[in-house]
């Protein structure tokens, strides 16, 4: 009787995929998963199951396994540690060989690592906490179209955070009135105004009309203030072709920056747009609409720092990153952790800030973090202290809510910002004297 060389049937994952003696390679992509196994499932088996199902494995041995080198291609769970203070939660560290992923494709990276495993029966919950992207892989990405330094040079704005404002009411204005609101804000002293993430091309305001009126507002404000101004024209659309059509039109109008919702639009569309922006000198502002669907649960989904790393590879010059002080959730150290991951070239492993791996970006351009959502002029000292110069501070209601109107609201924000930056440069302690600084400036 002929034998095929292996026994049929269900096989424990940990026999193949749990390898505590494995030494990680410099080219491996490393992942830290927070695993909550079902009762009765040992953590090694749960960790190995994640490694298997997100790389080469399936639930049984198949005869085609003999046609490839599993040792070369399999993901490996190489370490497991309990999560302090949590019952039956573990951090499983998984190493993936570089060759499992297509070069320059965030889409493929995510399809592999988080594509299938999250519905797995052996797990009660699963969260991807962090990824280490090796230089061998990150170098296959173009990254941000321009990055922080080039953006400052284009705008001729140095030594301070940039100021933005989302135009409200977000839906319902006509294009002409929308342009008017943009003009008032920019004239008052803001650097940027922004389309809301859900302003695309609706019946009350078609995209082309909005683009034209916003460009007019921009040029008028530029002429009056002598400063370079921008408005994030949202190019997000139902199809990639339509998105590119909008980006091309923005370029023809000569505006400096366009915008994209990268999670709802998808990484494929985002990377396409980022390449176009680099080739055509457009800055790219990224909004993270839908992120909380993915990242808000503590024990399931994916931490925002992973989405932030993915965006830096896919490409964007600004990305929304929480405020630490406004209306939306975000803890200070953890937020600062992924803010540094966006801006800096080299970030040390630091568990207190939620950073599981040392990340070296090998000179990939940085992304400006955008603080937006429920912040106003009294937050200015805290914001300048927390985010430093390389950031964009966006006040929607905090500008447009000024009782005298948009332009005075914009003036108030700009004055407050300049006062805080000056106070900081003079060595004053913003945490203690912040309110005093703002009061003095308000005179």
UniProtKB/Swiss-Prot annotation:
Binds 1 Mg(2+) ion per subunit. It catalyses: 2 (2R)-3-phosphoglycerate + 2 H(+) = D-ribulose 1,5-bisphosphate + CO2 + H2O; D-ribulose 1,5-bisphosphate + O2 = 2-phosphoglycolate + (2R)-3-phosphoglycerate + 2 H(+). The keyword Magnesium applies. It is found in: Plastid, Chloroplast. This is Ribulose bisphosphate carboxylase large chain. GO terms for molecular function: magnesium ion binding; monooxygenase activity; ribulose-bisphosphate carboxylase activity. It comes from the Eukaryota. The modification N6,N6,N6-trimethyllysine is found at residue 7. The record marks 327 as: Transition state stabilizer. Heterohexadecamer of 8 large chains and 8 small chains; disulfide-linked. The disulfide link is formed within the large subunit homodimers. Keywords: Calvin cycle, Carbon dioxide fixation, Chloroplast, Disulfide bond, Lyase, Magnesium, Metal-binding, Methylation, Monooxygenase, Oxidoreductase, Photorespiration, Photosynthesis, Plastid. The modification N6-carboxylysine is found at residue 194. It comes from Abies mariesii (Marie's fir). Its cofactor is Mg(2+). NCBIfam families: PRK04208.1. Substrate binds at residues 116, 166, 170, 288, 320, 372. Belongs to the RuBisCO large chain family. Type I subfamily. The keyword Cytoplasm does not apply. The basic functional RuBisCO is composed of a large chain homodimer in a 'head-to-tail' conformation. In form I RuBisCO this homodimer is arranged in a barrel-like tetramer with the small subunits forming a tetrameric 'cap' on each end of the 'barrel'. Its EC number is 4.1.1.39. Mg(2+) binds at residues 194, 196-197.
